[in-house]
């Protein structure tokens, strides 16, 4: 049985930061993810920052985290929200190339010292005398001194589309069932919170002549507070459709 100081279950944004923080503090760390396509995956709106969140990305960066650095690498558009108001409410938001974001963060994880990234599903947390002793995956067992559970919405996940319900992780990915039961058997209450994701459309199906273009100047501000860190990106435009409830009901966008 391989031994680790810390095992992190789940390689979403939280799991990635936890694993990197542990490894960078000198702890032998294992990061578990069901599949490579789940690492740093943006299942909802592919953006980083924004109102109420942009400052958190900066705080993660100040603590040595990776999200801000990676967001700068994969950004296709940046905008400072609330720029007409006072500096206290300025909020940097970056729209991301979700595929590039994944590629860049995987590169970072794979070269990080003290960190192993394995594509295995964690099925059980080993607990003895109320202390975590290890984890069991669909392929192996690992001994550890501590475990971080960062599974997001994968625990017994469901997808709801109108009247249609399907047992699944986000975007049709595999959900975690055995780990849910393991956590419950150890007295941990599992609750679900519903999130909403807008429908996606093909960009080639849009009649842009009916939309308004907002010219967005390339931001000189990055999430990473390092002067000169800018990377070349192809800036995308923002398009607006004005309507309301009637336009939504009649499909006249």
Regions found by a protein language model. Give the residues of each.
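Functional-site microenvironments in short loops/helix caps that host divalent-cation chemistry
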Residues: 224-253
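Beta1/beta-strand and adjacent pyrophosphate-binding region of the FAD-binding site
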Residues: 2-14
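Conserved N-terminal/central alpha/beta ligand/cofactor-binding core
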Residues: 20-126, 146, 150-170, 174-180, ...
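Conserved beta-strand-loop-beta-strand element in the redox core of flavoprotein oxidoreductases
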Residues: 126-141
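Flexible, active-site-proximal loop/turn residues at the rims of small-molecule/cofactor binding pockets
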Residues: 12, 153, 246
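Short aromatic/basic micro-patch
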Residues: 116, 141, 231
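Conserved phosphate-binding elements of NTP-dependent enzyme cores
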Residues: 8, 18-19, 132
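Core beta-strand elements of the Rossmann-like FAD/NAD(P) dinucleotide-binding domain
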Residues: 2-4, 138-146
């Amino acid at each position: 049985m391989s031994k680790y100081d810390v095992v992190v279950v789940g390689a979403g944004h939280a799991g990635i930061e936890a694993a990197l923080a542990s490894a960078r503090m000198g702890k032998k760390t294992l990061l578990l993810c069901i599949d490579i396509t789940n690492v740093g995956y943006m299942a909802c709106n592919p953006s980083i920052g924004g109102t109420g969140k942009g400052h958190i990305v900066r705080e993660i960066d100040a603590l040595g985290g990776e999200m801000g650095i990676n967001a700068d690498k994969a950004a296709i558009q940046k905008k400072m929200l609330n720029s007409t108001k006072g500096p206290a409410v300025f909020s940097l938001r970056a729209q991301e190339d979700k595929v590039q974001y994944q590629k860049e963060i995987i590169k970072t994880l794979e070269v990080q010292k003290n960190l192993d990234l394995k594509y295995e599903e964690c099925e059980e947390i080993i607990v003895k005398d109320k202390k975590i002793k290890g984890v069991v995956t669909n392929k192996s067992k690992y001994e550890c001194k501590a475990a971080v559970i960062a599974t997001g919405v994968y625990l017994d996940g469901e997808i709801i589309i109108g009247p249609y319900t399907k047992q699944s992780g986000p975007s049709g990915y595999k959900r975690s069932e055995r780990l849910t039961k393991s956590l419950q058997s150890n007295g941990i209450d599992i609750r679900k919170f519903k999130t909403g994701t807008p429908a996606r459309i093909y960009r080639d199906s849009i009649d842009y002549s009916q939309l308004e273009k907002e010219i967005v100047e390339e931001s000189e501000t990055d999430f990473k507070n390092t002067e000169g860190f800018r990377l070349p990106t192809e800036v995308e435009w923002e398009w607006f459709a004005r309507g309301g409830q009637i336009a939504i009901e009649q499909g006249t966008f």
